[in-house]
From Swiss-Prot:
Record keywords, A-Z: Amino-acid biosynthesis, Aromatic amino acid biosynthesis, Decarboxylase, Lyase, Tryptophan biosynthesis
Name of this protein: Indole-3-glycerol phosphate synthase
Organism the protein comes from: Bacillus licheniformis (strain ATCC 14580 / DSM 13 / JCM 2505 / CCUG 7422 / NBRC 12200 / NCIMB 9375 / NCTC 10341 / NRRL NRS-1264 / Gibson 46)
Family statement: Belongs to the TrpC family.
Membrane-traversing stretches: none
E.C. no: 4.1.1.48
Top enzyme category: lyase
Catalytic reaction(s) noted: 1-(2-carboxyphenylamino)-1-deoxy-D-ribulose 5-phosphate + H(+) = (1S,2R)-1-C-(indol-3-yl)glycerol 3-phosphate + CO2 + H2O
Length: 252
């Protein structure tokens, strides 16, 4: 699936027409993760659909969802901007950024410098770079470009070999372990436990995918994760406000 998405992304890049720079002020994604509202930082995802599950939320209203997440004391937001596979839009990110005070991550499949420029212009505070989608040197170049634009970078990896290849080139400030197996699409938070041993001291570790209950939060925290990225389990609920409270075992 990842290869299919990347192939499509290569085609779409050729059609990108950069929009006017919205000049929205940058917020520090990393600082928000390091000063969380709870025992582990929450990056709450604004996500309409996925390739495996189809439409997750009918009547999708990104700004309303983002405001509920903010009210529920999420630390950062992640907004899907990929259209063909996730039914996302750049405008969703810009609208969300204008409506809340939280840092916003652009969740997309970034493989080219024009996408980094685009992320900056639409108001992203951080971008996602996927280790399995890029050669380590290319990833480093895009990483540096984003940092020069004032954005943070979440470097996501699924497997040990990918992470080791990246660490041979440079040490990212933020590493996300995606708990989804790219071969069978199953998720296990045990992947965070295995990968945490490879993450250098001083790097912020995020656990992503397959997190749906408070026990998962406690488990990945004990493994060394300082933050979690949660999307589908929150988006499936009718109220994202209540969904966040439920995830943390709180009374909303």
């Amino acid at each position: 699936m990842l290869n299919q998405i990347i192939d499509r992304k290569r085609e779409d890049i050729l059609k990108i027409k950069l929009s006017e720079d919205l000049k929205l002020p940058k917020r520090s994604f990393k600082k928000a993760l390091l000063s969380p509202n709870r025992f582990v930082a929450l990056i709450a995802e604004v996500k309409k659909a996925s390739p495996s599950k189809g439409v997750i939320q009918e009547g999708f209203e990104p700004v309303k969802i983002a405001k509920q997440y903010e009210q529920a004391k999420a630390d950062c937001l992640s907004v899907l901007t990929d259209t063909p596979f996730f039914q996302g839009k750049n405008s969703y990110l810009s609208d969300v950024k204008r409506s809340v005070s939280l840092p916003v991550l652009r969740k997309d499949f970034i493989i080219d410098s024009i996408q980094v420029e685009e992320a900056d212009r639409i108001g992203a505070d951080a971008i996602l770079l996927i280790g399995e989608a890029l050669e380590p040197q290319k990833l480093f170049e895009l990483y540096q470009q984003a940092v020069e634009k004032g954005m943070d970078v979440l470097v996501e990896v699924h497997g040990e070999e990918t992470l080791e290849g990246i660490l041979n080139v440079f040490t990212p400030e933020i590493i996300g372990v995606n708990n989804r197996n790219l071969k069978n699409f199953e998720t296990t938070v045990g992947q965070t436990e295995r990968m945490a041993k490879l993450v250098p001291p001083g790097t912020v570790l995020i656990s992503e995918s397959g997190i749906g209950k408070s026990e998962d939060l406690t488990f990945v925290k004990t493994c060394g994760a300082q933050a979690v990225l949660v999307g589908e389990s929150l988006m499936r609920e009718t109220s994202q406000l209540k969904a966040v409270y439920a995830l943390f075992g709180e009374d909303g």
